[in-house]
């Protein structure tokens, strides 16, 4: 009888686990219809308007053509292209200066929004009626496209210009995790008090920034979001174009939120190799940890920020007084995480300190979910 009871109990547990487990699919981005490709929803808004476009190499239509080329073929009057970190063609490395200039293919003036000029000026916006924003985000607070979007929205609000955000899949949109940024640690790699992984598409994020009045002085812009079609939030999306030079595939995008924490240490993350953000290297020990297989094995289970790698690296390099650099606090957004890691706290102990902030954020996030 006891064996039967235990067997029945095991079946109940198994069923419960299967019900609660999230089926995380790996999909091609083409399985969702991007906002850019839903031209019937926004082309009428551009008729007889002077248009500026915020775009880069990821701003492609579902048929593979570039947004700017497509709009020009439809007769849209694009007078200026604004481009973020990595440049209009997406070839500049992280942190590399992005110069303004003229696009060789179209002859349209390109204005860089990375470097000293992160926010469009009134002069640069003069004569523009509508700003069309179309960048592929990866759902991570320190990925700077959402910061560029914030400055674009702010400049638009100050100059009476409408903003249309063309939504795209968030390849890390299936979870929310990480410490919520403290106001005193705001920077271009973290402008808002949200967790590291915030679980919103870039269109939803724009709505949150506007709705919560996070622009300077609480101003709001005239914002329209063109939603995705056939979007599944509970999926990893294989993007057709890499969003930036060092995120070449879905594995790097999936691992990026966790591995980017190493950018605030003296541990390498594979920049300049064939596996950027898929490995980490401890040069002092001449050791490299390859996580490509991890991404494939655990993508259905590890729907969280993984701290075990940085905790392990710190333990192995416990005598390295320069393990952390000053950039670490900017990345993580909180002042005490470095101390917690140095003191030997476990991942669970550290994670528990985030929960109240995450719970409060989830209440805000819920108001802006489209999908």
Language-model features: where?
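Conserved anion/nucleotide-ligand pocket segment
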Residues: 186-258
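Conserved functional hotspot residues or short segments at active or partner-binding sites
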Residues: 276, 281-355
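Glycine-rich oxoanion-binding loops at beta->alpha junctions
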Residues: 98-128
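Bacterial Sec-dependent N-terminal signal peptides
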Residues: 1-25
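Short internal beta-strands
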Residues: 79-86, 166
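Glycine/threonine-rich flexible loop motifs
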Residues: 137-149
